[in-house]
Amino acid sequence: MAKKILYQDNARRALERGMEIMVEAVSVTLGPKGRNVVLEKSYGSPQIVNDGVTIAKEIKLLDHIENTGVSLIRQAASKTNDVAGDGTTTATVLAYAMVKEGLKNVAAGANPISIKLGMEKASQYLVTQINEFAQPVEDIQSIQQVASISAGNDEIIGSLIADALSKVGKEGVISLEEGKGIVTELEITEGMKLEKGFISPYFITNTEKMEVSYDNPYILLTDKRITLVQQDLLPILEQITKTKRPLLIIAEDVEKEALATLILNKLRGIINVVAVRAPGFGELRKQMLEDIAILTGGTVITQDAGLSLDNIQLNLLGQARRIIVNKDSTTIVSDGQTLNEINIRCEQLRKQVNIADTGYEKEKLQDRIAKLSGGIAVIRVGAVTETEMKDKKLRLEDAINATRAAVEEGIVPGGGATLTHLSENLVTWAKNNLKEDELIGAMIISRAILAPLRRIAENAGINGPVIIEKVQQQEFEIGYNAAKNTFGNMYTEGIVDPAKVTRSGLQNATSIASMILTTECIIVDDVKSSNES
């Protein structure tokens, strides 16, 4: 296929046009008075969302060059979502504001490489400032505030997540399920999270989240390597196929031939299966498999017990209410049938902790106790329609991620107030520490970081620049409450953002924007020539 090549300002402007289209679609959701976006689906009913990264993933333009701009800015949203789990809309708005400001200066003759250096130095300065101003999250009220803001000012969701975290702890697992009624409920159930993910991405059932999710599965536990399905697994697979239930295999390893056979059976729809390597090493691996067996009511297939894979029955397999497997971890939600056995096992492990010889042994035993007894918080999402259900689930996911981020790195004033206040600090610092085009780069950042507050105000129907000026005249804690159209202390009003979300959004936006500003040429497929041919 022939290629289309654009140089210099033409290239950068084409990228900017694509970015602008996407930012307009995403930024309407920003703030308490942000609107929703309707996404057409190739199957099923349209989806109504208020989540930046979900909207960003749906946008694809006809013009290949403009679409490249969309893809680049989408990276800022996706990376922020991967690191912090929230703040995707803010990252998108920031990246575009930086590009827009930067292009003016590049067109006027400033050196893009020096601008990039200045932007990076300014970003590093702002990150240290954010960390300095961040307040630790210690009480349940702060957790509730963060969760409520992230869920679109939904206080009910906020209190649910705060309740869930207080019950399962900071490291605990919170799982989302579709409820049967219209009320969203919280349930604490037995369960375990393993630090091992699927062996192959071909097992994925949900491509949007890149995860495997099955209800009511059988669980096969073994400390052996599975080499050939025909030799090792065929009898038990035939039994499971008759039940039409999915299967989770946790083994030392699944070798290429066996893995290929399992994937083929999954893709053909013969059996829903996912394979995971057993966690730990050596003796610890066997002990952890025993723990999983107790949780799921199964038996570990091991030669020590005189068991082999080729002659096992269904009664030796474990069972669970639900499993969720991604590339890094496996979450098993128990069906609650083995509560008594779990308590006995935990008591045995506690006794072993008391007589353990080394600190390492104690640490591993305590880790196993925590995994067995910690439990999993299951939030059953209730809604009137399926469309509302999907929107609620996205909001809950954002809120859970934001809350974890807040516990990790603390909170800062929300509603764009933190970056607005730091803009003036940055100007002072840059004038004292940078010069020439590097100073211009820092000034680009200082103006761009006002964009989130401006957009929040505009979405509420208020003049953005006026709000920015008023906020900058106040103390650091004071910001703009768009929901009430008032100014006040962001901490006492509960309008707070996780420092990690603000930090990662800023860093990813700076990274993408500085790369675009240093672009001198774009090469894309020429659609016209391909159509003619």
UniProtKB/Swiss-Prot annotation:
Cite the Gene3D superfamilies for this sequence. GroEL, GroEL-like equatorial domain, TCP-1-like chaperonin intermediate domain
Q: Where does ATP bind?
A: 29-32, 86-90, 415, 481-483, 497
Query: Which residues form each disulfide bond in the chain?
Result: none
Q: Does the keyword Plastid apply?
A: yes
Under the heading InterPro entries, the entry gives: Chaperonin_Cpn60_CS, Cpn60/GroEL, Cpn60/GroEL/TCP-1, GroEL-like_apical_dom_sf, GROEL-like_equatorial_sf, TCP-1-like_intermed_sf
What biological-process GO terms show up in the record? protein refolding
Localization, per the record, is: Plastid, Chloroplast
The record describes its quaternary structure and partners as: Forms a cylinder of 14 subunits composed of two heptameric rings stacked back-to-back. Interacts with the co-chaperonin GroES.
**Entry's family note:** Belongs to the chaperonin (HSP60) family.
Q: Write down what this protein is called.
A: Chaperonin GroEL, chloroplastic
Gene name of the record: groEL
